[in-house]
Structures are given as structure tokens and as C-alpha cells.
Swiss-Prot record:
Record-linked HAMAP family: HisZ (MF_00125)
Protein name as it appears in the record: ATP phosphoribosyltransferase regulatory subunit
Keyword Ligase among UniProt keywords: no
Cross-referenced Pfam families: tRNA-synt_His
Lineage: Bacteria, Pseudomonadati, Pseudomonadota, Alphaproteobacteria, Hyphomicrobiales
One of the GO BP terms on file: L-histidine biosynthetic process
Note: This function is generally fulfilled by the C-terminal part of HisG, which is missing in some bacteria such as this one.
Gene Ontology MF annotations: histidine-tRNA ligase activity
Species: Brucella abortus (strain 2308)
Family that this chain belongs to: Belongs to the class-II aminoacyl-tRNA synthetase family. HisZ subfamily.
Keywords: Amino-acid biosynthesis, Cytoplasm, Histidine biosynthesis
Predominant location: cytoplasm
InterPro entries: aa-tRNA-synth_II/BPL/LPL, HisRS-like_core, HisRS/HisZ, HisZ
Assembly, per entry: Heteromultimer composed of HisG and HisZ subunits.
Keyword match NAD: no
């Protein structure tokens, strides 16, 4: 069998045909990318896996670890009109304990579409069609989550803005969420800060704290430019202190845990969420209207809603995801079975420097996993 890393493999050519049929411009993205956008916006797991280097000017560069960020940066650089659909098919590079560090991804980024529900449904339908074109008989599991419903739940519970931001950053990471909820209940013990730092944190003196942190880093032989800056660390320490001073009623936290435990088929999800909101006097009306509109659009796209699992705890701990998130998985492989993943990232292009808000939704397919699955089923 031809390795999936080859651009001459049958799966590569088959996916090129699928992408060309979906009204998306196939773009070429340079292998060498500025590292900062990935370091600033990617999740902790991806940051650890990036291959970093520098040019002769000392600028941080990396081998392309994924496509969404560079495709969006390319769109901004070209000052391209929207709506616009981009397709990609090429190598990405990530450090792995096992297996090759170079592998292929394919996907579509849909930028600037006015109809959010329709473009969400189209993204899922396109991803599913691409997967089924390569592995038509494989048992698949589709899991869907919604960052905006979780955000609406936090607001309805009356959580302060700081805690909402913290919990949203943990959404989709079960361990991080457990730690955050333990902090919110006051049951998570924190290591005490040295007294000199603790005084500045208690006073909210971000400038003084940053100066002291920088001095300590230099004394320890650590470059202040490596990783988070002293200012960022100071801001995070003060934020943690403010959050630690807030404790929330146990009953409200119990409701949040009940919400995160909701896992039903998509055809029952809106009914389940509306009943949960009504039973607990929670105002989720606006976000549930959008949720229902998307579910209707998914049904109109020809996807059986009963075949999709809505998991209220499923998300991605990245600041730029704003709504839909989904994965298409190999139902026979629970350990490493994610074949494709996608979601809505309406904040990303603004964070990358776009002059105006540009909504976006897209997906990526893991070709190595898909080829392995297709080979097993042949």
C-alpha cells in the first residue's frame, strides 16, 4: 500500500477530486510559517508539538503544524472578498511520540458566509462526504458540541465574566474543567506564592509584579522572551487571585455539572436542552434558537440527526471557537479514531488582524487515519 505521506497515493488523488467538486479554491500554503500566530492561538497540546526554528534575523518560524491559521492569514493578506471557500491538501508537521512527524491533511475553510446555520451544516456535510468517499463502509460516529450553548449556560447561571472566560478556556478539556470547577467551589488547594510576589498580586500591581518576575527570570538565567512574558504571567496571577476570591453556590455548580453530562442524539437535543432550561429557570432562549436553526439545516443537508450525538461537554479549549464543534470518528477505534474535526471560529480572523469581523467555519481530515481505516475495510 502506498504510504499516505505520498502525494501520489490513491487517497490523495481521490480527496483532490472530492475537494474540487465543492466550490472551493485549492490553495498552496508555504511549509515555513511565522511561529507566533500558532504559539499565541493554538492549544497547549499543539504548541508542544510544533517544530520551531529561527531565521537569520532571529524571527521565530515553524514547520506548518496545521492549515486553518495560515489559510486565514493568507485570506487577510490578499484582502480577498467574502464569502470565499478555500480547500487545502498537503503536509503538516507535528512532533509525536510514535509514528511519523510528517503527515497529510485535507480540508475546507468557509469564510464570510452570511447564513451561519447553512454554512455550519455544509461544513459537516462536506467533511462527511469526503470521509465516506474514501471509506464508504466504515462504521462512523459523529459527535457535535456547541461553544455558544455552554457560554449561554454560564451567563444564565450568573457567573462573573472572569470565571466565564476561565471556564470557556477549559471547555472540551475534561481535566482542565475539573480543576476549574474545583477552584470555583474552593476545594482546590493552591500553592502559596512567595510573600514578595503575594503582596503585589494582592494589590493588583501588574507593572511592579512584571518587573519583579522579569528580574527573577534573569537571575535564574531564563530569557523573559521565552514562553509567556513577565507581563502575561503577572496578569494571569492577578486574574487567578481575583477568581479565587469568588465562590459560587453549590446548587448552581451542580446544575453546571448536570448540563455537561447531557449526551443525546441530535434529534432529541433541542427538546432536552429546552426542558433542562425550563426546569431550572435558565434563560437559554437565544442560543437555543440558533442551535435549532443549525439542526434543521443539518437535516436539510440530508444528514440523519439520529446518527449524530450531541455532547454538551464536547468543545475545544481555544479562544477563537465560537459555536459549532464536531468530530467524525471511527466507531471501532475509541483510542485514536478521530478522522475529521471541524468547527466555527468567528473570532479567529479578527485575532489575526482582519480589519472587520469575518465569520468562519471549517474542517480538517487526517489522511493517515482515514487510509488506515479504508485499508482495513477493503
Amino acid at each position: 500500500m502506498t504510504m499516505v505521506g505520498s502525494r501520489t497515493s490513491p487517497i490523495f488523488n481521490a480527496l483532490r477530486v472530492e475537494l474540487n467538486a465543492r466550490e472551493a479554491e485549492l490553495v498552496e500554503i508555504p511549509l515555513i510559517q511565522p511561529a507566533d500566530p500558532f504559539l499565541d492561538m493554538a492549544g497547549e497540546d499543539l504548541r508542544r508539538r510544533i517544530f520551531l526554528t529561527e531565521n537569520e534575523n532571529g524571527d521565530s518560524l515553524c514547520l506548518r503544524p496545521e492549515f486553518t491559521i495560515p489559510v486565514c492569514r493568507n485570506h487577510i493578506a490578499l484582502n480577498a472578498a467574502t464569502p470565499k471557500r478555500y480547500a487545502y491538501l498537503g503536509e503538516v508537521f507535528r512532533q509525536r511520540r510514535d509514528g511519523a512527524a510528517e503527515f497529510l491533511q485535507a480540508g475546507i475553510e468557509d469564510l464570510g458566509a452570511a447564513d451561519e446555520a447553512a454554512s455550519d451544516a455544509r461544513s459537516l456535510a462536506d467533511a462527511l462526504s469526503c470521509v465516506k468517499a474514501i471509506a464508504p463502509d466504515a462504521p462512523l460516529e459523529i459527535v457535535l458540541g456547541d461553544q455558544s450553548v455552554f457560554a449561554g449556560m454560564l451567563k444564565a447561571l450568573g457567573l462573573p465574566q472572569g470565571w466565564r472566560k476561565k471556564l470557556l478556556r477549559s471547555f472540551g478539556d475534561a481535566h482542565s474543567m475539573d480543576l476549574a470547577l474545583a477552584e470555583l467551589t474552593g476545594t482546590q488547594r493552591r500553592d502559596p506564592l512567595p510573600e514578595s510576589l503575594a503582596v503585589l498580586v494582592a494589590e493588583g500591581d501588574e507593572i511592579g509584579l512584571a518587573r519583579m518576575l522579569e528580574a527573577e527570570m534573569l537571575e535564574a538565567g531564563i530569557s523573559p522572551g521565552a514562553g509567556r512574558t513577565p507581563v502575561e504571567i503577572a496578569r494571569r496571577l492577578i486574574e487567578k487571585e481575583d477568581l479565587a476570591a469568588t465562590h459560587f453556590p453549590a446548587a448552581a455548580l451542580d446544575l453546571l455539572r448536570q448540563f455537561l453530562a447531557i449526551r443525546v442524539s441530535l434529534d432529541m437535543a433541542a427538546v432536552t436542552l429546552r426542558a433542562f432550561a425550563a426546569d431550572n429557570a435558565l434563560d437559554l432562549g437565544a442560543v437555543l434558537q440558533k442551535f435549532e436553526a443549525r439542526a434543521d439545516a443539518i437535516a436539510q443537508a440530508g444528514i440523519e440527526m439520529k446518527d449524530i450525538i450531541y455532547d454538551a461537554s464536547f468543545g475545544r479549549p481555544l479562544d477563537y471557537y465560537t459555536g459549532l464543534v464536531y468530530e467524525i470518528r471511527d466507531a471501532s477505534n475509541r483510542q485514536d479514531g478521530v478522522l475529521a474535526g471541524g468547527g466555527r471560529y468567528d473570532r479567529l480572523l479578527t485575532m489575526l488582524g482582519a480589519c472587520e469581523a469575518i465569520p468562519g467555519v471549517g474542517f480538517s481530515i487526517w489522511l493517515d487515519r482515514l487510509q488506515a481505516l479504508a485499508g482495513e475495510k477493503q
